Amino acid sequence: MDNEKGLLIVLSGPSGVGKGTVRKRIFEDPSTSYKYSISMTTRQMREGEVDGVDYFFKTRDAFEALIKDDQFIEYAEYVGNYYGTPVQYVKDTMDEGHDVFLEIEVEGAKQVRKKFPDALFIFLAPPSLDHLRERLVGRGTESDEKIQSRINEARKEVEMMNLYDYVVVNDEVELAKNRIQCIVEAEHLKRERVEAKYRKMILEAKK
């Protein structure tokens, strides 16, 4: 039988909810076979991050040139910085039968939903907004004003939860990782994803 086309897995949620931490734990698991689509951003690199591994870090001018060339599946400006997902890698990798994993902002996920309605959308939620504030403060990288801005934005993003297929609460990183892996496995077993393949098998058997 032909290889099944890869699944586009979209993980997003409020800033500070732990998207990057959960994504890293998923890809540290030897059983993970997803391909990670690295996003581009104009924000400053944080301690421990590596260009071309965590993000492609670009200047604002360089990013805007790529926007004009229509090189993104999605892009968004969030708290003064651009974030975007390069388009060609995602399409090529899915056509090869690989699942592609995107870790993006909520505004970007809305754009992906329009272009890839069959993608799998997972919202990573904090146990509470107070818990989210503690995480942001614990980073020690932003002012109180910036943190409050992110909390205000998080309230709006939680209200957009209905755009997603699944919600995973990040109360513990290992549990969140396991839940996401189970969701992806179940998604591959959906009747609408495998039906065409088996119909083709039946037709070929009748020849």
From Swiss-Prot:
Catalytic reaction(s) noted: GMP + ATP = GDP + ADP
Domain Guanylate kinase-like residue range list: 6-185
Residues reported to bind ATP: G13, P14, S15, G16, V17, G18, K19, G20
Cited SUPFAM superfamilies: P-loop containing nucleoside triphosphate hydrolases
InterPro entries referenced in this protein's UniProt entry, alphabetically: GK/Ca_channel_bsu, Guanylate_kin-like_dom, Guanylate_kinase, Guanylate_kinase_CS, P-loop_NTPase
UniProt EC number: 2.7.4.8
GO cellular component, one term: cytosol
Broadest EC class assigned to this enzyme: transferase
Source taxon at top rank: Bacteria
Gene Ontology MF annotations: ATP binding; guanylate kinase activity
Keywords, ordered alphabetically: ATP-binding, Cytoplasm, Kinase, Nucleotide-binding, Transferase
Compartments where found: Cytoplasm
PANTHER family: GUANYLATE KINASE, GUANYLATE KINASE-RELATED
Function according to Swiss-Prot or TrEMBL: Essential for recycling GMP and indirectly, cGMP.
Similarity comment text for this entry: Belongs to the guanylate kinase family.
Protein's name according to its UniProt entry: Guanylate kinase
Species of origin: Staphylococcus aureus (strain bovine RF122 / ET3-1)
Name of the coding gene: gmk
